[in-house]
Swiss-Prot record:
Region (Disordered), start-end ranges: 183-212
Species: Mus musculus
InterPro entries: DUF5588, TPR-like_helical_dom_sf
Name of this chain's protein: Uncharacterized protein C8orf76 homolog
Residue stretches of biased makeup (Polar residues): 187-196
């Protein structure tokens, strides 16, 4: 290279070659976690943030509810509801749910159902719908209304078919002999003038546009049986006894099938669980095994049930259920996500099992008619 030539960009500032002063790292400031004394939210606060004050009140209501002081919790929730801004939808829904649950525990089921119906009308996503259905389930379980409890579980399972705990609850509901809905209480929280010995007319049951919990407009099966028996008791007793026995057997089959599906779901989920979640899973599987054994069904019957109830179960679906996203949709789409009736649900899940037992049932009916 000739003298005097220079390379473009080949010049450097002298500061590049200077030794930089050594930096001594300062010790990081110690982390100080905020320590809260037990029941700190009962202390007087000078906070000027209205939302912060309302949040403290909600904590007080939640603690009272946990202690089963439902009247006190209801007072806290009600005072919050009056002061909450209309734009705070999340807390408003939480508070309203708390109010409804307190009312149910206090025996004010009609008011609880009215609040549940209001939450239902404002549901805009699958999480909202799940909360509404769980709320209805709590109210109807408190009322010991077997028919409506089962329908709530059908709707929950239609929304979350891979949830094993809902299937366990459904099995329990099928085996419970609870009475029907008390007179004067309608499924949607409105007064019903229908008497206890008549079918409830369509006009007496609130089923607003797009209602998610459209409940049957007839009395539960046990009420219908009692009405029929009162007409000609002597003539109908053998027939009623047979029907009652068949209904009990069908309920046992549905309960067993529900437990088998719950066990299949738990078995698939256990590989992704640890600690207390895994312990609960394994303990529940053992309990299910004991209950299934108590049904005394034949082994080939149990295999048929297990095959029918596990047709849609694949590991990929379990992962999707565990990490599912909240779907924000309109009321019409939410309504389409749940079943319209128990018949629709049972046709989907138990039809194959029922068809397996139909020949035996038909043969039984023929034998009864010949003997008669």
């Amino acid at each position: 290279m000739e003298t005097g030539c220079w390379v473009l960009g080949g010049e450097f500032e002298d500061s590049v070659f200077e030794q930089r002063p050594e930096r001594r790292p300062e010790p990081p400031s110690p982390y100080r976690a905020k320590l809260c004394e037990p029941q700190w939210f009962y202390e007087e606060t000078e906070c000027s943030d209205d939302i912060e004050v309302l949040t403290l009140k909600k904590f007080r209501g939640d603690l009272a509810y946990r202690r089963q002081e439902y009247e006190k919790a209801l007072q806290e929730y009600s005072s919050i509801s009056e002061q909450l801004p209309s734009t705070n939808f999340a807390m408003k829904r939480d508070v309203q749910e708390g109010q409804a649950r307190c009312l149910a525990h206090l025996g004010r089921h009609e008011e609880a159902l009215e609040m549940a119906a209001d939450l239902e009308s404002k549901a805009t996503n699958t999480d909202h719908l799940t909360v509404v259905l769980h709320l209805h389930l709590a109210v109807f379980s408190s009322l010991q209304s077997r028919e409506h409890t089962i329908l709530c579980l059908h709707k929950l399972i239609a929304l979350h078919p891979l949830n094993p705990w809902s299937w366990c609850k459904l099995a329990e509901a099928y085996l419970s002999p609870g009475p029907g809905l008390p007179a004067g209480v309608s499924p949607q929280g409105q007064k019903s003038s229908a008497s206890s010995d008549k079918a409830v007319g369509p006009s007496s049951v609130h089923s607003g546009t797009g209602s998610l919990l459209s409940l049957p407009t007839t009395l539960p099966e046990n009420a219908l049986l009692s009405v029929e028996a009162s007409g000609s008791a002597q003539e109908n007793m053998p027939s009623l006894a047979r029907r009652r026995e068949e209904a009990q057997m069908e309920a046992r089959r549905k309960a067993c099938a529900s437990l088998l599906r719950a066990r299949l779901l738990l078995q698939l989920a256990q590989s992704q669980q640890t600690s207390f979640a895994l312990e609960k899973n394994l303990r529940t599987q053992q309990e299910i095994a004991g209950k299934v054994k108590d049904f005394n069904f034949r082994e080939d019957t149990l295999l048929l049930m297990e095959e029918a109830m596990g047709e849609d179960i694949v590991p990929e679906k379990i992962k999707e259920e565990l990490h599912s996203e909240v779907k924000c949709v309109g009321p019409g789409a939410l309504t389409a996500m749940v079943v319209a009736s128990s018949k629709e649900f049972e046709d989907k899940w138990f039809r194959k099992i029922k068809d397996h037992f139909c020949p035996l049932g038909n043969q039984f009916h023929v034998e009864v008619e010949i003997i008669a």
